[in-house]
């Protein structure tokens, strides 16, 4: 059997009737459990102007997570680079490296993490051009290598640290696989966003990969929704709830937080709705522990991934916690 590492991604989602404060508290509690259960890394996301997600500043949240953990790797999944100055991102993650030496990952992406208007307010200079994103990545690497030269001298990202956080490039379309390979970065494919394309993107990445100091060989993560439950009935409820949330997000109708299953179980779906839900099923893995284990092994083997990063959205925080506990158990981590 392929040796698969398991990690977690959390977005600090807000359930209907709950608060953002509690959502962040649940994330903090979850990272401690993830460390106890033996997960390899724990990443948090960047989203803006979304009523159902509290995680807007991963660099701030990671600092707190570092203070309550000892060994687990912590990172961003990801920093949406066009929203930020490359220098400021380099400084933020070097500072995080001083809090948790050897435990920080910098996952970067080019999506806005919200709507285009909000992205423009975050960075009024954002032209939404791919070439600008590539330039920012180059700048980021130069800052990490203390090689940014201006007419007035070298500009350094402070503080200077012994080890730089590894850069992971996030992609959901596969286009960034070329860039990640050419630059010698890690690749994280977001199958939780895009149901298809992981295998092709990873093949391109591994074929083109140019070794770098931090990544002497290609490394691949696939991030996917994982819902693991004690019974098939419970797994079905969690899956249907998540598919409903996807549908509402696509329609722009998630305004009051994540709803409970009882509220949506009799929803009058149209034929088009059901078709979308069926298509979105490929973005997730759901079932009992053994069923989930088989699907994860098949996914990692088929796509040649080194690591699976599990994410989950549930109305009850304890359902998410139980899901990840069962996942750790079935893989023999606890």
Q: What is each residue range found by the language model?
A:
Residues 1-2, 62-70, 97-103, 147, ...:
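Acidic (Asp/Glu)-rich catalytic clusters
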Residues 1-69:
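N-terminal beta1-alpha1-beta2 module of alpha/beta enzyme domains
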Residues 2-20, 83-147, 187:
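Flexible, glycine-rich active-site loops centered on histidine and acidic residues
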Residues 6, 38, 46, 65, ...:
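Conserved, mostly hydrophobic/aromatic
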Residues 6-10, 42-44, 74-76, 104-108, ...:
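Hydrophobic faces of well-ordered beta-strands that scaffold small-molecule active sites
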Residues 10-25, 79-87, 161-171, 280-289:
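Active-site mouth loops of central-metabolism enzymes
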Residues 127-156, 197-304:
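An alpha-helical appendage that flanks or caps ligand/catalytic pockets
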Residues 177-196, 201-202:
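A conserved active-site cap/scaffold subdomain adjacent to cofactor or substrate pockets
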């Amino acid at each position: 059997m392929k040796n698969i590492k398991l990690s977690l991604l959390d977005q600090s989602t807000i359930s209907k009737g709950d608060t953002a404060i509690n959502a962040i508290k649940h994330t903090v509690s979850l990272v401690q459990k993830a460390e106890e259960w033996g997960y390899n890394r724990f990443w948090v996301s960047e989203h803006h102007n979304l009523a159902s997600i509290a995680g807007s500043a991963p660099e701030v949240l990671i600092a707190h997570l570092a203070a309550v953990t000892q060994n687990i790797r912590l990172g961003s999944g990801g920093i949406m680079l066009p929203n930020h100055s490359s220098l400021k991102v380099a400084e933020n993650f070097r500072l995080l490296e001083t809090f948790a030496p050897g435990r920080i990952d910098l996952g970067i992406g080019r999506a806005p993490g919200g709507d285009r208007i909000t992205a423009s307010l975050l960075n009024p200079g954002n032209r939404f051009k791919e070439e600008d994103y590539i330039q920012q990545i180059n700048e980021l690497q130069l800052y990490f290598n203390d090689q940014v030269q201006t007419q007035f001298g070298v500009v350094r990202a402070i503080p200077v640290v012994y080890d730089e956080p590894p850069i992971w490039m996030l992609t959901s379309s596969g286009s960034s696989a070329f860039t990640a390979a050419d630059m010698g970065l890690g690749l994280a494919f977001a199958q939780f966003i895009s149901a298809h394309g992981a295998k092709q993107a990873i093949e391109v990445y591994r074929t083109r990969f140019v070794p770098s100091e931090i990544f002497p060989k290609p490394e691949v993560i696939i991030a996917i929704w994982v819902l693991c439950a004690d019974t098939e009935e419970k797994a079905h409820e969690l899956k249907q709830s998540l598919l409903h949330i996807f549908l509402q997000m696509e329609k722009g109708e998630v305004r009051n937080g994540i709803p409970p299953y009882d509220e949506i179980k009799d929803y009058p779906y149209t034929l088009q709705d059901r078709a979308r839900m069926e298509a979105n099923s490929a973005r997730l893995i759901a079932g009992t522990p053994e069923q989930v284990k088989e699907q994860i092994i098949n996914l990692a083997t088929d796509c040649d991934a080194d690591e699976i990063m599990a994410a989950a959205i549930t109305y009850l925080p304890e359902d998410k916690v139980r899901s990840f506990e069962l996942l750790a158990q079935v893989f023999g981590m606890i």
